[in-house]
């Protein structure tokens, strides 16, 4: 099917240090369609870069693929790689977006983080990206972000 995929169907070595090289993609079987794909990671963890305390959140990734789609096991391993990574919530979300845009070159992509509150404040960063033809869609999504 797609022999170049390394993670799917293989024994899983879990890496808990940020590593964008874990992400893999496969050819979009229907590049003429524009599905809005939602991926949800309910167990995202990273470390506060100041206190080294763990942060927990749900990461929502939505995208309209162009020629490539993200392989879900590689995405899981990539998101797990944040486990011992010290970074602010906003930085995690921005980096996830940039890594996925570099890998997929999608028509549209957004990342939203719903982080558990610490000190009584919940941080919920949102960032999105679009190619020229999807800029209007991007603006509408930004205005309607949670």
Swiss-Prot record:
It comes from the Bacteria. It catalyses: 7-aminomethyl-7-carbaguanine + 2 NADP(+) = 7-cyano-7-deazaguanine + 2 NADPH + 3 H(+). GO terms for cellular component: cytoplasm. One of its GO terms (biological process) is tRNA modification. InterPro entries: GTP-CH-I_C/QueF, NADPH_dep_7-cyano-7-deazaG_red, QueF, QueF_type1. Substrate binds at residues 70-72, 89-90. GO terms for molecular function: preQ1 synthase activity. The active site is at residues 48, 55. Its EC number is 1.7.1.13. Catalyzes the NADPH-dependent reduction of 7-cyano-7-deazaguanine (preQ0) to 7-aminomethyl-7-deazaguanine (preQ1). This is NADPH-dependent 7-cyano-7-deazaguanine reductase. It comes from Helicobacter pylori (strain Shi470). The gene is queF.
